[in-house]
Each structure stands twice: as structure tokens, then as C-alpha cells.
Amino acid sequence: MAIRLTHLRKPLAYSRSFDVCIPFFRSISSFEAVEKAIKCAVETKEYLRIPELVVSLKEPYQNSTLFSFLSAFQRHHRIRVIDEILQSFVPVRPRSLPKIVYSSLLTYCLQSSDPLPLSFAILQRTLRSGCLPNPQTHLLLSDAWLERRRGSQSVADIINEMKLIGYSPDTGTCNYLVSSLCAVDKLDEAIKVVEEMSAAGCIPDVESYGAVINSLCLARKTTDVVKIVKEMVSKAGISPRKGMLTKVAAALRANREIWKAIEMIEFVESRDYPVEFESYEVVVEGCLEVREYILAGKVVMRMTDRGFIPYIKVRQKVVERLINIGEWKLACTVRQRVSELRS
């Protein structure tokens, strides 16, 4: 059953009731005292005081214990309170002022017995405020997500639970989940999220694919990365960002799979997306490394068709290797095409 929430759209006015609870909160320095003051602020709905209280600490605490008192609340009450806190921060300027509060709330929720979907709501508000969660969030979020997925729930079903507490899933929140899964080397699950998040109304973008592609390249999972690149340009209709194809080509070169790199470039161009100079350069160098000299010459010809000229050392090496194997005609054609472009 959906939980109805009353969102606070305006900053809360200052109330004298807060002074009754903590008459000298500016002098508070101990963690225990600040925690007690925050609890009082929640009881009196003086949520806008919470960032000041957290900042008053001598050290920037970013852990779950700052809001551990919320565990004593009933689930419905706890969700409502956290929602009210999040909504009260919307008009706060600078938007980064509640950063530590967001971080503490998110850590608390992710370590609770029922972390999702409330953690997604906090994460969404954090990202929309221009803040980034602390690095520990990647591990905690991945653990919480994988625990839910062990129950055989679909990606879309889990993400759509945000709607039950009054929040709409978005691509930015899903992208952070994808990057978290990549950060802990759960690449298969990250791919599933990218492929299925659209069923929850979150359309994958270049950030979604980019996170997975970067991680697959680092892991040299070339078969998977080529598949994802093809899905990105053919199914999603997304143009590769600068450097993306070069990174994939470099991974294929490292695995000595230069034919796959050429096939990938041809596929991307067949969908009318541009391939940058650096990608071609990596492929030519890879051809030379595996002694595919004729192939290197053909790739150089393809480069010149697009107005690209290989670096001088590379093109000289291509011509020399072609001459050495008796491919005089191709060597002369390559040299001529390069000269025409330079003139």
C-alpha cells in the first residue's frame, strides 16, 4: 500500500520551542550533545537547524549513529520524518549546506534493516542538491541492492518502490547505483541495471553506458564491452562521448583483438556516429603490433577518407612494413593519400 506523505514546500519558521530543548546549541561540541539536539530538532520540526548543529561539531561526523535515534520510530513515522527533513532542505542556499546531513542520513538508512527504497530518496535529494555521497556509499548501496536482488525481484520493481513513498525514480539515481556496482566489480549486475532501468521510466544515458564501458575496459572484458557499445548506438541511439571508443579500442588492442576493434568502428560508423582520430590511431598501432601490415594500410586509407592523417612515426612505419612484405602498390597509395591531405 502506498504511503501518503505531506511534503514541506517552504522553509520552516524558527520556533522558540527549539530554545526550550537546547538553549545554547552553538556551544555544543560533543557528539552526544549534538545528537540529542538533533533529536530535539526533529521532535519540534526545526529541521533547518540540523545543518548548523552538525557543523558545530569539532569533526565532520558522517556516519549512521548521528541519526540512530530514528530506529526507535515506527517505519511509517520514520519515513515521514526523513521526507520532511529532505523537503525542508530544498530551498536552502547554498544547496551544499546540508551535505553532511544528507551523508549521515544516507549512511544510516543504508545500514538499517530496510534500506530501500528510502535510501534512493535520500540519494536522489543529495544528487539534486549538487552534492556527492561519501565514497563508502558505493559499497553500502551495492550491498543493499544485491541483498534485495537475491529475492528474485526485478530491477524495475525495486526502483519503482520509490513511488510508494512519494518519490519518482530518475536516471541520475540509477546512474549512481550503476557506478556503485561498477566500483565493487559487480559488472554483470551493473549491466542488468542499465539494460532494465528503462522499465522503471529511467532512460539510460551516456553516463549510464559510460560507467559500465569504463569498468569493462579496465577489466578487459572485451566481448561484453563491444556488445554494450553496439547496444548504446543501435538500441539507445546514443552517440559515444569523446574518448569512449578510444578506450574500448585500447582494451581490444591490449588483448590483441584488433579485428574486433575494426569491426566495432565499422559498426558505429554504419549507424552514422563519428569515430574520433585517436580511436583510429590506436587501431593502426595495434595492427602493427600484431603484424597485420596490410590491415594497417587499409585502416590508414579509411582514416584519410575521413580527413585524418596518422602521426608521422606511425604512417612511416606502415609504409615501411608494407614495402618490406612486397606490398609496394598499397604502400605507394597510402603515401600518396597522406601527401594529398597534407597539401
From Swiss-Prot:
Q: Which GO terms describe its cellular component?
A: plastid membrane
Q: Where is the signal peptide?
A: none
Which UniProt keywords are present, listed alphabetically?
Repeat
| Highest taxon in the source lineage | Eukaryota
- Family annotation (Gene3D superfamilies): Tetratricopeptide repeat domain
Q: Where are the transmembrane segments?
A: none
Q: Which family does it belong to?
A: Belongs to the PPR family. P subfamily.
Residue stretches of each PPR repeat: 98-133, 134-169, 170-204, 205-240, 241-275, 276-310
> What is this protein's name?
Pentatricopeptide repeat-containing protein At1g06270
**What is an example of a Pfam family matching this protein?**
PPR_2
Which InterPro entries would you find in this protein's record? Pentatricopeptide_rpt, PPR-containing_protein, TPR-like_helical_dom_sf
